[in-house]
């Protein structure tokens, strides 16, 4: 039996789309999609509908009270681990990969139970609680920013963000007008916002709509374009990805 890979991603497109991009890339490299497994939640699976892979939907506990929340709801976490372990049993999973969020600690534990190599992708300058905890067990943490904080530097491997390499300008030109979304609302906002400023200076004549989440307490860009709209924060991120 061939060794297989399992991705853990939950929530909105920010955590799930990178996994989708990786799955597409693996398929292009010749990996059988039936040897790829994804653990996600109800929100996450909607971004994976067109992929012919093995998907398991779980309702992992979300802590709004840091580590204390996880401690108080430990039975729920154990139940999720049991369900996922049962799904992956006898599948010969060799690699576990997570894009973070509240599923990351569960991914770390599953990797230990399966004796699989564990990897993390960190999308922010400051790692979230899930990735901070899980990084202890990770073989490597792939970062989107060169100066990622609060994770052991020995484990960091700067790769940049995970993007869709199959998307070309010819694909975009098939549609009359596209909307580009820039997410500057998390850690790393300043770097992303500076990039948007430079992007608009060089690409302002393109037939694009721009939606830019700047993040709270960040300076607004003075961009004079009818196609550009900025907001501090978006409550429902699913709406942003639609």
Residue ranges and their predicted role:
Residues 4, 37, 43, 113-170:
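Active-site-proximal region of nucleotide-activated glycan assembly enzymes
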Residues 57-62, 99, 121-124, 144:
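Short beta->alpha connector loops at strand-helix junctions that form conserved
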Residues 37-39, 43-45, 51, 172-242:
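Donor-nucleotide binding loops and adjacent catalytic segments primarily
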Residues 43-46, 95-114:
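An aromatic- and histidine-rich active-site surface loop
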Residues 66-95, 113:
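An amphipathic, basic-hydrophobic alpha-helix
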Residues 15-29:
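Short amphipathic alpha-helix
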Residues 2-10, 27-76:
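Conserved nucleotide-sugar phosphate-binding/catalytic loop shared by glycosyltransferases and other
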